């Protein structure tokens, strides 16, 4: 009986500790993606060869 009690305590601890982490929202993911793409295009725009191929982004 004590073993069953310990098993229940262990399972509830694992379930609650893994559910505490809040996943990033779509809004946060979209902002991060936009920042990464802006940084990538800034690097591209400083490179003459890349800028020539992707002028519509610069």
Curated annotation (Swiss-Prot):
UniProt KW keywords: Acetylcholine receptor inhibiting toxin, Disulfide bond, Ion channel impairing toxin, Neurotoxin, Postsynaptic neurotoxin, Secreted, Signal, Toxin
Transmembrane regions: none
Primary site of residence: secreted
GO cellular-component term (any): host cell postsynaptic membrane
InterPro entries, per database record: Conotoxin_a-typ
Homology family: Belongs to the conotoxin A superfamily.
Protein's UniProt name: Alpha-conotoxin-like Pu1.6
Organism field: Conus pulicarius (Flea-bitten cone)
């Amino acid at each position: 009986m004590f073993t069953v009690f310990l098993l229940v305590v262990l399972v509830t601890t694992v379930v609650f500790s893994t559910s505490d982490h809040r996943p990033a929202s779509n809004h946060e993911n979209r902002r991060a993606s936009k920042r990464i793409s802006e940084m990538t295009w800034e690097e591209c725009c400083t490179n003459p060869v890349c800028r020539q191929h992707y002028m519509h982004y610069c």
